[in-house]
Amino acid sequence: MTKVGLRIDVDTLRGTREGVPRLLATLHRHGVQASFFFSVGPDNMGRHLWRLIKPRFLWKMLRSNAASLYGWDILLAGTAWPGKNIGNANAGIIRETATYHETGLHAWDHHAWQTHSGHWSIRQLEEDIARGITALEAIIGKPVTCSAAAGWRADGRVVRAKESFNLRYNSDCRGTTLFRPLLMPGQTGTPQIPVTLPTWDEVIGPAVQAQSFNTWIISRMLQDKGTPVYTIHAEVEGIVHQPLFEDLLVRARDAGITFCPLGELLPASPESLPLGQIVRGHIPGREGWLGCQQAASAS
């Protein structure tokens, strides 16, 4: 049996309102639990449209057929009008999720984090994280114990900024296996659970067709030599590609794969995890930099 951590990112108002309820129903039908990470502040995701001037982002949008994949309400959110507050508008849905699944913070403002966190000060990072955690805790009525940086925009500064929140783990980067981030000689931070597998929008296109994606990603899960972690998005697998995701759950079960919340991947003694660090890097299919796992001894 292959255990795969299932991470569900919720970036937008529509993803929360429409995608999450469908995902909850789908997961319930198949007896699967996952980790949901919510954006709880304003939905300004439409402001990413300026990135269309960047060839790699434009190609990604064309390759994934973004207009039909996400919908124009998502692609234009927060452009001509102020972004609506996601948490306030969908508190009941978020509370229901937290009743049945591990629930953590994705971002206060997903667009702001993805666009500006790379040059924010530690204090600005801490204030933004605190704002998101405070809002999410007010909604679910219990402490937030985990987080996942929006767009995997994380580096050593983000690791340090999250230390004061006493989280059980963070999932801020791409990598191969769980690790303890090295803060300074002799001091380590909150365990990191990297995402190890590609997302739908990173690979779909000429090389991998939609109808063959599930076969392809299951093969990658079975071949993963580290700790497999797979990310889906409420805006994609919860809406237009919900039937495809349900088919994935069936095929994965038949292949001997068991999905679980990320927290279940943590060992009883996190001190046994190897040391590492998060550095800025790039991966195929995703525009811009993102946090990548690196061995602590690397320069």
UniProtKB/Swiss-Prot annotation:
Domain NodB homology: 2-260
Induction: Induced by BasR.
Gene3D superfamilies hit by this protein: Glycoside hydrolase/deacetylase
PROSITE patterns found in the cross-reference section: NODB
Keywords in alphabetical order: Antibiotic resistance, Hydrolase, Lipid A biosynthesis, Lipid biosynthesis, Lipid metabolism, Lipopolysaccharide biosynthesis
Gene Ontology BP, a term: 4-amino-4-deoxy-alpha-L-arabinopyranosyl undecaprenyl phosphate biosynthetic process
Gene Ontology MF term list: hydrolase activity, acting on carbon-nitrogen (but not peptide) bonds, in linear amides
InterPro entries the record matches: ArnD, Glyco_hydro/deAcase_b/a-brl, NODB_dom, Polysacc_deacetylase_ArnD
Any one GO CC term of the record: membrane
Organism domain of life: Bacteria
Keyword Ribonucleoprotein: no
Enzyme Commission (EC) number: 3.5.1.n3
Keyword Nucleotide-binding: no
Catalyses which reaction(s): 4-deoxy-4-formamido-alpha-L-arabinopyranosyl di-trans,octa-cis-undecaprenyl phosphate + H2O = 4-amino-4-deoxy-alpha-L-arabinopyranosyl di-trans,octa-cis-undecaprenyl phosphate + formate
Enzyme class label: hydrolase
NCBIfam families: PRK15394.1
Protein's job: Catalyzes the deformylation of 4-deoxy-4-formamido-L-arabinose-phosphoundecaprenol to 4-amino-4-deoxy-L-arabinose-phosphoundecaprenol. The modified arabinose is attached to lipid A and is required for resistance to polymyxin and cationic antimicrobial peptides.
Designated name of the protein: Probable 4-deoxy-4-formamido-L-arabinose-phosphoundecaprenol deformylase ArnD
Gene from which the chain derives: arnD
